[in-house]
């Protein structure tokens, strides 16, 4: 499958990124889109983000514009509400500043097959990033429930995935079928779609692993006084500050595991 570029040589593009998350929503997708948009802009591309409205200010980056659209504040249903408003904004944007490629961040935007086809015909080819799937998450919730994980039933978002994940999967299926290219964030994510969905026979899917923020996810520098003091303060706050732990020895009487939701 080929892209229908407007010229034979593309030096720079106007990329419209349709992402339900963008800072100040620093979730997994929001963080990735923020950094990806910045890198694309540094390479000379013009990037426009279409995301959900937020009361807090959006961080600015050179070469990156951010457009906000309204959305229904309801679990799962927000993906369809946001998707409709994002499509309207995408049409308006294309009239003002022609778009060369549309990048959708699934599953947080729900478009129908008809809408994907319209975008491809009237605006630009669509590249869909596969950031996991609703069915995959639903099956994960079921597995957690079988292991008596009570939080599965207490979180309204997880409960919505359990009850409506199958319904909203049809929008992901539309994206898989009608995008020029699908980009899975991992081999396991690609296998997830191959197992639970129906990719076309000539499915153009590439796996591009998401990067890691090396400034955050790195071994601690215990020779740096401020970092060591912060490390000790964290340990002390959880009453896990025996001498072995503070000296970062492999064996400690107070092992500490932090489970952080992102």
Give residue spans per PLM region.
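Acidic anion/phosphate-binding donor-loop and adjacent secondary structure
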Residues: 194, 211-241
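Short hydrophobic "strand-cap" motifs at the C-terminus of beta-strands
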Residues: 18-20, 185, 208-211, 248-250, ...
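Membrane-proximal helix-turn-helix segments that form the acceptor-binding/catalytic region
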Residues: 150-182
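Short His-centered aromatic/hydrophobic patch
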Residues: 104-110, 130
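N-terminal subdomain of nucleotide-sugar transferases
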Residues: 3-56, 62, 95-97, 122
């Amino acid at each position: 499958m080929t892209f229908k570029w407007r010229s034979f040589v593309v030096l720079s593009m106007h990329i419209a990124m349709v992402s339900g998350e963008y800072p100040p929503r620093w979730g997994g997708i929001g963080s990735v889109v923020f950094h990806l948009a910045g890198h694309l802009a540094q390479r000379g591309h013009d990037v426009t983000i279409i995301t959900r409205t937020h009361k807090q200010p959006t961080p600015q980056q050179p070469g990156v514009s951010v457009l906000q659209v309204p959305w229904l504040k309801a679990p799962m249903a927000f993906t369809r509400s946001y998707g409709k408003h994002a499509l309207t904004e995408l049409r308006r944007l294309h009239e003002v500043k022609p778009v060369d490629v549309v990048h959708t961040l699934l599953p947080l935007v729900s478009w129908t097959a008809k809408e994907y086809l319209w975008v491809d015909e009237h605006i630009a080819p669509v590249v869909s990033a596969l950031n996991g799937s609703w069915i995959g998450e639903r099956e994960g919730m079921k597995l957690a429930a079988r292991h008596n994980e009570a939080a599965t039933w207490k979180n309204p978002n997880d409960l919505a995935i359990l009850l409506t994940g199958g319904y909203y999967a049809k929008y992901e299926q539309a994206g898989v079928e009608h995008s020029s290219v699908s980009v899975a964030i991992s081999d396991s994510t690609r296998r997830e779609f191959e197992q639970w969905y129906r990719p076309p026979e000539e499915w153009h899917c590439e796996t591009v692993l998401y990067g890691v923020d090396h400034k955050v996810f790195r071994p601690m520098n215990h020779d740096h006084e401020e970092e060591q003091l912060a490390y000790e303060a964290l340990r002390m706050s959880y009453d896990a500050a025996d001498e072995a732990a503070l000296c970062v020895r492999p064996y400690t009487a107070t092992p500490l595991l932090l489970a952080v939701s992102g």
